Design a protein with these regions (language model features):
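Acidic, serine/threonine- and proline-rich intrinsically disordered appendage/tail regions
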Residues: 161-192
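Tryptophan-paired
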Residues: 3-172
Length: 192
């Protein structure tokens, strides 16, 4: 976790509940192609069970400082549904578009007061691109001393190895290390 410099928050903390991988290919090509991978009507994908973080570290005040987990999967190389243009956008804004979802107004949400829209498909990410969901509770004290708690699920599409927002590839025989920095309910930073 890292407090954004423009916020007067204190005690920023994350209590991880678990993680899971979504859209793991159940098959892979025996030999690599120059572009793309096994895809089409006969291809299947699965979602792993939610697992606890393998490591978590806390400071002297018992505030979350880091955590981690490891997984292995077949390659999954996808072309974006829609390319992200870098014109006039910072790297952080380009990255945020990778996780952008379409929002559907499907009517009345009497069971969810205040909700007007339902999340739809990803706007830029391809339908079968692999992503990791990390869930937990994010909390902090705001600048008025009020404690803010939120049950959160952060989505991180794999790829982005060279900072390219249109890269959704996970290549075979490649080790990726993702460093995810939580900076708030709607704010994460990623290094690959």
């Amino acid at each position: 976790t890292e407090k954004p410099s423009d916020k007067n928050w204190t005690a920023l903390d994350f209590r991880p509940r678990g993680w899971r991988v979504v859209n793991v290919p159940a098959q892979s090509l025996l030999l690599p192609h120059g572009t793309g991978d096994a895809d089409g009507d006969g291809c299947t994908y699965f979602t792993t069970e939610e697992m606890p973080f393998e490591t978590t570290e806390r400071d002297d005040n018992y505030l979350y400082t880091s955590g981690g987990f490891v997984f292995y999967m077949p390659e999954n190389r996808k072309t974006p549904k829609q390319a992200i243009s870098g014109e006039g956008l910072s790297a952080a804004e380009q990255y945020a578009l990778r996780e952008e979802r379409e929002h559907k107004n499907t009517g009345d949400y009497t069971d969810k007061p205040g909700q007007q829209f339902e999340n739809g498909d990803f706007a830029y990410a391809p339908a079968n691109a692999t992503y990791v969901e990390m869930s937990g509770t994010l909390s902090y004290k705001d600048d008025k001393g009020n404690t803010v708690n939120a049950d959160v699920t952060f989505t991180v599409h794999l790829g982005y190895a060279d900072g390219n927002p249109n890269d959704y590839d996970t290549r075979r025989n490649t080790r990726y290390i993702y460093t995810v920095t939580l900076r708030g309910i709607n704010d994460i930073r990623l290094e690959v």
